[in-house]
Amino acid sequence: MHISKLPAALLIFSVALNHLKATPVRSGTNHQMDKRKCNTATCATQRLANFLVHSNNNLGPVLSPTNVGSNTYGKRSAAEIPDGDSLDLFLL
């Protein structure tokens, strides 16, 4: 992205974030869980990315929307969690 396009991109980003509002989905007579209101930065960024993908933006390449749930954020795989033995090396 060129430097001259950066202020325009930031302006569009701030306007889009101001217009994004999370509304809970109303459940009918069945006992389904309502959709959580999304106030986290990760969720807002995800919603902005989906908004830009579905709109006709000319800021960059068209990326496909990601389909991840709210349970994905903040999760680690077991391979990333350090074990206690590797932490002992830092104490030496």
Swiss-Prot record:
Propeptide: 23-34, 77-92
Modified residues (Tyrosine amide): 73
Gene Ontology molecular function: hormone activity; receptor ligand activity
Listed SMART domains: CALCITONIN
GO CC annotation: extracellular space
Cystine bridges: 38-43
Signal peptide, first to last residue: 1-22
Any matching Pfam family: Calc_CGRP_IAPP
GO biological process: amylin receptor signaling pathway
Regions that span the bilayer: none
Keywords per UniProt: Amidation, Amyloid, Cleavage on pair of basic residues, Disulfide bond, Hormone, Secreted, Signal
Top-level taxonomic group: Eukaryota
Location(s) in or outside the cell: Secreted
InterPro entries hit by this protein: Calcitonin-like (IPR021117), Calcitonin/adrenomedullin (IPR021116), Calcitonin_CS (IPR018360), Calcitonin_peptide-like (IPR001693), IAPP (IPR000443)
Chief subcellular location: secreted
Similarity-based family: Belongs to the calcitonin family.
Domain remarks in the Swiss-Prot or TrEMBL record: The mature protein is largely unstructured in the absence of a cognate ligand.
Subunit structure of this chain's protein: Can form homodimers. Interacts with IDE and INS. Interaction with INS inhibits homodimerization and fibril formation.
PANTHER family per the UniProt record, alphabetical: CALCITONIN-RELATED, ISLET AMYLOID POLYPEPTIDE
Function: Amylin/IAPP is a glucoregulatory peptide hormone that plays an important role in the regulation of energy homeostasis. Selectively inhibits insulin-stimulated glucose utilization and glycogen deposition in muscle, while not affecting adipocyte glucose metabolism. IAPP function is mediated by the CALCR-RAMPs (AMYRs) receptor complexes. Amylin can also bind CALCR receptor in the absence of RAMPs, although it is more selective for AMYRs.
Name listed for the protein in its UniProt record: Islet amyloid polypeptide
Taxonomic classification: Eukaryota, Metazoa, Chordata, Craniata, Vertebrata
